[in-house]
Amino acid sequence: MFVAVRAGKSACRRVSGEAVRVAVDGVVGVVGAPLVSGESAAAGAGGSGGGAPAPPRLPRVPGFAARRADGSVKARGKALRERVPRDAHAEFVPDPARPDAVGAVEESGRGRIPALTPLRVGRMAANPFAFLRGSAGLMGYDLARTPMTRITAQLCGDAHAANFGLYGDARGGLVVDLNDFDETVPGPWEWDLKRLAVSLVLAGRVAGAGEDACRAAALDAVGAYRRTMRLLARLPALDAWNAIADEELVSHTDAHDLLGTLERVSAKARANTSGRFAARSTEATADGGRRFVDAPPVLRRIGDAEAGAVAAALEQYLTTVSEDRLPLLARYAVHDVAFRVVGTGSVGTRSYVVLLLDHRSEPLILQVKEARPSALLPHLATAGFDVPPVAHEGRRVVLGQKRMQVVSDILLGWTTVEGRAFQVRQFRNRKGSVDPAALAPDQLDDYGRMTGALLARAHAHSADPRLIAGYCGKNTELDEAVATFAVAYADRTEKDHAELVTAVRAGRIPAEEGV
């Protein structure tokens, strides 16, 4: 199911028949206040005649809403405008104690594999959009000092424009959604939305779009978020929950200029499978199996001890996947493990690929990726949000992903390798993505609307859409404010990127560029 998100368009929707379960403790609202109040409100009949209302037949059940709320949730959201006017979101004044860009990059590299630091720096130095992708923590520092309603949702934590893409569902279809959750954590919904808007401005500038087109993409992304949240607030709870993001989303977001690009990406995604990766990255062994082949610096073989530790950790992984998936995994044998570099912000973390083969020697590739503490955690604390302890970082990533996506990888899980937390997922699951920095201006605007709508749907799984919709309202005041912020923060990011490039050229920080 999805919706039309351009003003004046009639709403369309498509409902999937399957809901995704999430933990009820992931539903959060205004910090320090319940989403639904009024537990003592009378619920039964017989309260007429001026006497005391009859007590409800059943008590309030923990984990469920109260039968009747005092006042409107949407009205409570609207009332927040008095404390945080919507136009206040245009503000961006860099803190005098803000870390310099090079220092922030160096700090974010602590705990990563030192030999891969030059590769990570080189990727971030490629352009300002790439710098933004690798600096979620630095932006978190800045966002912690911006106006906030204090409505919380499960955040992606790194909702830049390149973190949306296509992937396969269990039935062979393609889903369009957020697809990376390394930084996921409950936090203020505005942070994800502002990061998306900034990234669209930077992607447009890298692509050579004019300033008006870049700002329009950010503006329309926020508008799509606002209108989608408003519609979700009006739907029955189950329909809103099951709002699905699939290949038909483009027609519902009026993103027709993006059709050709999405069709090409979809065709590539359908061919992006474990089988194809194994055909290019493995070779036959004497015992009839297969093993990975070296392709440095991205893919490299590892020693027996390291490979054995990763393989042994899969036993713990099996305890974290849904029990109905165990018979499927039991049909595969573990053949090999290799190290594979991924992403921009993730470069330097430990990431492995595991080759599994079934009885026909058909491959399934699992990714075992290190899960580090979210880069947003210290900044949430600075902003005054409660930051509960995390028992396992891999579990945090997996549960955050399931809370935000309508359809998630059926093999998601987590494990521990030599004391480090990891997440486990399918490596090639018909994944595809649009490069926002390669889009024409009219396509970038469409892409902004599509991703804004997707982000609203993802947030509505954990925050009450009525609360956010009440705050956002019907007019474009919030859209204009966040677009103004996005342009200002994009300017700051360009300066940060220039500082990094200068440091690389001066030899202050090593970089391996073009890889």
Question: Could you tell me what each predicted segment is?
Answer:
Residues 45-50:
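Intrinsically disordered, low-complexity regions enriched in glycine and serine
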Residues 35, 55-81:
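Intrinsically disordered, low-structural-confidence terminal and linker regions
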Residues 261-346, 355-357, 363:
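Acidic catalytic cores of enzymes that act on phosphate-bearing nucleotides/polynucleotides
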Residues 251-263:
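Plant regulatory low-complexity segments
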Residues 72-89, 93-117, 126-156, 161-254, ...:
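Conserved ATP-binding subdomain of kinase catalytic cores across diverse folds
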